[in-house]
Amino acid sequence: YLIPEEAERDIESPTLAYVQLGLFMFGALAAVIGYLFGIHEGREFLEQPLWIKVAITVVALIFLYNVSLTVLKGRKTAISGVLLLGLWGTAVFWLFAFYDPANLSVDKLYWWYVVHIWVEGVWELVMASVLAFLMIKMTGVDREVIEKWLYAIIGLALFSGLLGTGHHYYWIGAPGYGQGI
């Protein structure tokens, strides 16, 4: 709903969106069934078998294709730009889930890239853009004011979120400067 409304354009390919939904539902169901029968990699939050991770990546790429073309061919706003940055960041940091080193410390280093930077980094961009969209639509506040605050919010969220990731690295043997931050 948000993307077509903000871009003032229909979604690029509704058929592709339905294909993506079907693949997503199949992958989610397969992952849950796999968890029930003990078919997983054993990494917390990243325990999906490789073929499900590949399916998640394909679904994400279909989604990004559809959303990106909708925004790029429609009206470009700060809200849609921040939303696209967050969605692409989510996809990029997901790629670290494929790397599964034998060394536990190295594994945790990359694990935090996916888990922590998602939550306190790129998902903050998605949430801030959705919040800005809702503020404009529900309160009638001027778009310029909301977009200025959007930039302030995402700047603070990214800065504090990325710094906040550093304290996790202390416990895996990385330099201790992240602990003090």
Which residue ranges define each predicted feature?
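Hydrophobic, membrane-embedded alpha-helices of multi-pass small-molecule transporters
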Residues: A91-A97, I117-A128
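Conserved, charged catalytic cores of large soluble enzymes
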Residues: Y99, D107-K108
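Membrane-interfacial alpha-helical segments at the cytosolic side of multi-pass membrane proteins
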Residues: Y1-E6, V122-M138
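Membrane-interface helix-loop-helix modules in multi-pass inner-membrane proteins
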Residues: Y1-G74, F98-A102, G161-I181
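Histidine-centered catalytic micro-motifs
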Residues: Y1, K108-V122
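Membrane-embedded translocation segments of transport machinery
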Residues: V115, S129, I136, R143-I181
